Amino acid sequence: MKLRKLGRSDLHLTPIGLGTWAMGGGDWKFGWGPQDDALSVRTIHEALDLGINWLDTAPVYGLGHCEDVVGRALKELKGRRPIISTKCERCWEPDGTIVPRLKRASIHREVEDSLRRLGVDVIDMYQIHWPQPDEDIEEGWSAIAELVKAGKVRWAGVSNFSVAQLKRLQPIHPVAFLQPPYSMINRGIESEIIPYCEAHDIGIIPYSPMQKGLLSGKVTRAWVDALPATDHRRGDPQFNEPLLTRNIALNDALRAVATRLGTTPAELAIAWVLRQPRVTSAIVGARKPGQIAETIGGGRLAIPSDALAEIAKVLA
């Protein structure tokens, strides 16, 4: 896969990055159901063997567990080090209650915890997970700027921020990248965020390009009904009526386009996100060996103009 430069940074990413959210397991509010840690480690190794050069994680995934698993996978690589992206702001109490914090002291504590769990000396890409509390985003961003100067973080970014919030950060420290949700179903960044990032050389690394699996081509009503009780998608409006019927119909239409192109609906969904010049790389989740091999072709697929026009009609 051809590497792409991430905004103003000196990082060059593969068009697909491995998302590890599901590797946090199901024992927390936003889990994806039970997960085998050994399979998670094998999945990380397989993604790197296939050529992916970066992965995205967060402390809150499994309340620290996901970063521990990633750290285990990195240790077993014996020196072969991918680019690591992780986050701060989503803290939790002893009972598992998630609490947003953007105070200087909490962020300095979080970065030390992440460095320890991951087993690394520096975090390549560090970002505020959510802009909450909003009144503290300047303090939180100033703390991350300190971490960059201290050499504990290479490049600083944010996730789920609006243009208005990005503008508040820029005078403190330049934003190198933004991680927003973006897919055929969720296109909210197209009108304002993408143009702003283009104007300010901010790289975009969208998450959920397959809308949590809804655009994988595998979704049926029975598939949704079979989701584990601890899978947070059971409470996602996109996985429930009245939106589910629309999303299943969208899957059927995309499957027809993908078949004509000799690809899969999942790869088509990923390539559609990557068609945006300002998008550097798409975060694609996997939780067991074989899954990333089913989607990695999306990083190489160039969708013909007639197919893009057909997709536009489907999405209209």
Name these PLM-found stretches.
Residues L77-L102, H129:
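Structural motif corresponding to the early beta-alpha repeats
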